[in-house]
């Protein structure tokens, strides 16, 4: 089988690979990333390779790493960053719960008024504005 990169006529030497060399694999990743509009590079420091993009039927998956030898290191770094974000979210929720618990025994009459004036049929909010989830950092390209 020949290399799938345009203009290359070399044979693929490794079973299961699509390109003949590592350099051509990065060029293929760059072509796929340009095709779907992804400009992100590998999460590993001083790597500079393009991330892996897997195109499915209706969606495409963008990974944080290029898939070379430091894939496990990148995965651990992303997991620790996500863990820190979730700790911050839980900390903010605990602070909000303690603040509302202090107010709840004094404002029972106002809760009843609020329930009576409540409009039904309004949509629920799925993402809150007042709690920093860190979602913008998770999906930053």
Swiss-Prot record:
Principal cellular location given in the protein's record: host cell
Region (Disordered): 94-117
Keywords: Host cytoplasm, Host nucleus, Host-virus interaction, Inhibition of host innate immune response by virus, Suppressor of RNA silencing, Viral immunoevasion
Short motif Bipartite nuclear localization signal 2, span: 111-128
GO cellular component: host cell cytoplasm; host cell nucleus
Annotated compartments: Host cytoplasm; Host nucleus
Compositionally biased region (Basic residues): 102-113
Residues in coiled coil: none
Keyword Glycoprotein recorded: no
Motif (Bipartite nuclear localization signal 1): 75-91
InterPro entries tied to this protein: Tobacco_rattle_virus_16kDa
One BP annotation, GO: symbiont-mediated suppression of host innate immune response
Role of this protein: Weak suppressor of RNA-mediated gene silencing, also known as post-transcriptional gene silencing (PTGS), a mechanism of plant viral defense that performs sequence-specific inhibition of viral mRNAs expression. This could be used by the virus to infect efficiently the host the meristem cells.
Listed name of the protein: Suppressor of RNA silencing
Species of provenance: Tobacco rattle virus (isolate PpK20) (TRV)
């Amino acid at each position: 089988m020949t290399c799938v990169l345009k203009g290359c006529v070399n044979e693929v030497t490794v079973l299961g690979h699509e390109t003949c060399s590592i350099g051509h694999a990065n060029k293929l990743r760059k072509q796929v990333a340009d095709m779907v509009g992804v400009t992100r590079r590998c999460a590993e420091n001083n790597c500079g390779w393009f991330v892996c993009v897997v195109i499915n039927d209706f969606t495409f998956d963008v990974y944080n790493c290029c898939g070379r030898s430091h894939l496990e290191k990148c995965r651990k770094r992303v997991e620790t960053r996500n863990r820190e974000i979730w700790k911050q979210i839980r900390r903010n929720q605990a602070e909000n719960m303690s603040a509302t618990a202090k107010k709840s025994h004094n404002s029972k009459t106002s809760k009843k008024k609020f329930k009576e004036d409540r409009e039904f049929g309004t949509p629920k909010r799925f993402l809150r504005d007042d709690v920093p989830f860190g979602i913008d950092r998770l999906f930053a390209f």
